[in-house]
Amino acid sequence: MWTGYKILIFSYLTTEIWMEKQYLSQREVDLEAYFTRNHTVLQGTRFKRAIFQGQYCRNFGCCEDRDDGCVTEFYAANALCYCDKFCDRENSDCCPDYKSFCREEKEWPPHTQPWYPEGCFKDGQHYEEGSVIKENCNSCTCSGQQWKCSQHVCLVRSELIEQVNKGDYGWTAQNYSQFWGMTLEDGFKFRLGTLPPSPMLLSMNEMTASLPATTDLPEFFVASYKWPGWTHGPLDQKNCAASWAFSTASVAADRIAIQSKGRYTANLSPQNLISCCAKNRHGCNSGSIDRAWWYLRKRGLVSHACYPLFKDQNATNNGCAMASRSDGRGKRHATKPCPNNVEKSNRIYQCSPPYRVSSNETEIMKEIMQNGPVQAIMQVREDFFHYKTGIYRHVTSTNKESEKYRKLQTHAVKLTGWGTLRGAQGQKEKFWIAANSWGKSWGENGYFRILRGVNESDIEKLIIAAWGQLTSSDEP
Ligand SMILES: *[C@@H]1O[C@H](CO)[C@@H](O)[C@H](O)[C@H]1NC(C)=O
Ligand SMILES: *[C@@H]1O[C@H](CO)[C@@H](O)[C@H](O)[C@H]1NC(C)=O
Ligand SMILES: *[C@@H]1O[C@H](CO)[C@@H](O)[C@H](O)[C@H]1NC(C)=O
Ligand SMILES: *[C@@H]1O[C@H](CO)[C@@H](O)[C@H](O)[C@H]1NC(C)=O
Ligand SMILES: *[C@@H]1O[C@H](CO)[C@@H](O)[C@H](O)[C@H]1NC(C)=O
């Protein structure tokens, strides 16, 4: 009985081999040479697959450790095959050309390559010759049965996300769909937008809050708890490099509300600044915060409701739709109705000249607690875009080629409070709470926490604030 089975199995195998030989001879592949080159490929299920010298690895190109993403349909076997270093140990589900491509590529003459008549494969799907697909920030064209991809560095990098999330850095990273598909270059070009502070700004005298030095500062402080309804949450600058305008308008709005004791609680319009602050003419193309504060002092802004953000920041008709004139008694009035005609109030809000707050942590805390949120100029690096939750500190990429993945640029945000947390090792970790301008889906509801007291990402280097210009008639 057992012998009978053996004969059956044997004859089955011989038929299989014979059929494969027939098949291959039709395709003019030198089976003989392949067999003598390495006999180990003759073992078990490997045999059947090994004789198909397909395009898998050539097209998908991954020969690293087990990579579940690097899988493709193996047509002949109606199965999935992998193309990665795991195949060194476990061969049953490896792409047929794993060895030839990843281990012995040079020995293969180019004429053995064509197997599929035309086109390329990706995730088990066939694409015509000349097809273009997008892979994150790169586009790949199927040409000569291979995907040829552009080599941009992408803003979202899974290795970096993984590195942050596996490490003990105090924060976690996420893949944001709004950044997926952008190059690193474009991320820095479109999502930040504050010019490095001018020497004039940096040489400003530092003011210290008038609170006595001995004031007890709480462990935890959030501006929106102390002044509910008077402070303003993060907006989304989208692909408009204008953090210079978003942070300035937001700090000014909070401070006018606090100073007027809730009489004027409108958020101020960053679009008004972007479109009308003429010296920053390329509003979505970065600007300086000195000019923003100058504009708030000299011209004033209407509310965000009156002059909302344009849907398409790249629209060419992005001209200034608001003007103000002086009434001769130190107040300015709008000369045009609101661009958003549903909003009737086109009141102009103005500020005092800005002042610099000391970089001393305690001084910054006193200033926020006494007068409201402040503007902070920070240096943003590539990992910051991935921030999801926790206390941010810069994580240096461990990638060997990390130079090309690194970038650094100035950004402006709003500090709204602080706190203390016990770290994983039980140590005390102090943080600032800051509002970014990347919408509420980013970070902690649009906010982030960042290490406090160690000048992380230069967050304490330049702190700016201003007073609202309220006349006696404005006083509540
Ligand atoms: C065949 O491949 C195995 C595993 O890749 C290798 O260890 C062996 O040296 C190869 N033999 C020949 C003759 O190339
Ligand atoms: C990241 O998100 C995008 C869009 O939401 C998605 O298409 C992509 O597969 C994700 N990438 C990773 C590595 O998770
Ligand atoms: C905006 O327009 C410029 C020039 O026309 C272009 O280079 C850029 O990619 C556009 N940005 C977006 C986000 O569409
Ligand atoms: C910061 O200012 C406080 C007083 O407000 C002072 O006690 C402290 O030493 C200063 N810290 C530094 C680093 O200068
Ligand atoms: C913060 O760091 C920057 C750059 O390292 C430095 O220029 C600046 O003086 C530092 N500021 C403080 C307050 O330590």
From Swiss-Prot:
What pairs make up the disulfide bonds?
A: 63-70, 70-102, 81-83, 81-95, 87-94, 95-102
Where is this gene product found? Secreted, Extracellular space, Extracellular matrix, Basement membrane
- Which PROSITE patterns does the UniProt record give? SMB_1 (PS00524), SMB_2 (PS50958), THIOL_PROTEASE_ASN (PS00640)
* Highest taxon of the lineage: Eukaryota
Q: Does the keyword Glycoprotein apply?
A: yes
Transmembrane portions of the chain: none
Per the record, the coiled-coil ranges are: none
Q: Using the record's annotation, list all stretches that form the SMB domain.
A: 59-107
Supply one GO molecular-function term: cysteine-type endopeptidase activity
Query: Which coarse location class describes where this protein primarily resides?
Result: secreted
* Record's keyword terms, sorted: Basement membrane, Cell adhesion, Disulfide bond, Extracellular matrix, Glycoprotein, Secreted
Q: Where is it found, in Gene Ontology cellular component terms?
A: basement membrane; extracellular space; lysosome
Task: Give the free-text PTM comment from the record.
Answer: It has been suggested that the active SMB domain may be permitted considerable disulfide bond heterogeneity or variability, thus 2 alternate disulfide patterns based on 3D structures are described with 1 disulfide bond conserved in both.
User: Record's InterPro entries?
Assistant: Papain-like_cys_pep_sf (IPR038765), Pept_asp_AS (IPR025661), Peptidase_C1A (IPR013128), Peptidase_C1A_C (IPR000668), Somatomedin_B_dom (IPR001212)
Q: Could you say which residues are annotated as the site Cleavage?
A: 49-50
A biological process term (GO) from this entry? proteolysis
The record lists glycosylation at 38, 175, 314, 360, 455
UniProt tissue specificity: Expressed in the kidney cortex, small intestine and cornea.
Miscellaneous notes: Antibodies against TINAG are found in sera of patients with tubulointerstitial nephritis, a rare autoimmune disorder that causes acute and chronic renal injury.
PANTHER family, A to Z: CYSTEINE PROTEASE FAMILY C1-RELATED (PTHR12411)
Family designation: Belongs to the peptidase C1 family.
Per the entry, what this protein does is:
Mediates adhesion of proximal tubule epithelial cells via integrins alpha3-beta1 and alphaV-beta3. This is a non catalytic peptidase C1 family protein.
Name-wise, this protein is: Tubulointerstitial nephritis antigen
State the encoding gene. Answer: TINAG
